[in-house]
């Protein structure tokens, strides 16, 4: 299949609307403001999920780290919404682009590191040299710890990109195989279609899990620097 070289730079659309608008509006549609005195079951489940996620991520933080609560909740909702919208047919998944994921990972990582150097300068510098290190190994360990620090945003972005891209490729390949097998063997095509359905369900779980993992790792980086 031939594609335009610059197709990845065009604004992705869905039903004629820019997908950015749908991504921004998706959390507000999924989690509307309650207008009842007593919440219904759906609203109660939504609030329980938000409280559970907040508790998992913020229980390890002190007061300084808990000021990032709104940022972390917004981040997991944004990534989760983007991943789920990307599973719709004929849609574009922005989180398959390494440039976008780096654009999220680098500022968040840099913010946690700057916070650590501002409020815990000695403790942040101490991470570069573990206590009790032999004198001949000091230069090597400082270099290794520095490299590991700068690899963190790359690991965040590559993990999210690789998992989402791999899932979409598998769905595309198995879907194409199902269409090709329909003219050859109906039974084999049906079995492949069942596998495709199961893989799609798995991708829904992966979309949410990857959003949680990305946000959790940012939360852990923040915990190390506050």
UniProtKB/Swiss-Prot annotation:
Pfam families for the chain: ATP-synt_A
Stored Gene3D superfamilies: ATP synthase, F0 complex, subunit A (1.20.120.220)
Compartments where found: Mitochondrion inner membrane
Membrane topology category: Multi-pass membrane protein
Top-level division of the source organism's lineage: Eukaryota
Gene Ontology BP terms: proton motive force-driven ATP synthesis; proton transmembrane transport
UniProt-recorded Gene Ontology molecular function terms: proton channel activity; proton-transporting ATP synthase activity, rotational mechanism
Transmembrane domains' residue ranges: 12-32, 68-88, 97-117, 138-158, 164-184, 189-209
General function of this protein: Subunit a, of the mitochondrial membrane ATP synthase complex (F(1)F(0) ATP synthase or Complex V) that produces ATP from ADP in the presence of a proton gradient across the membrane which is generated by electron transport complexes of the respiratory chain. ATP synthase complex consist of a soluble F(1) head domain - the catalytic core - and a membrane F(1) domain - the membrane proton channel. These two domains are linked by a central stalk rotating inside the F(1) region and a stationary peripheral stalk.
Identification of the protein by name: ATP synthase F(0) complex subunit a
Native source organism of the sequence: Halichoerus grypus
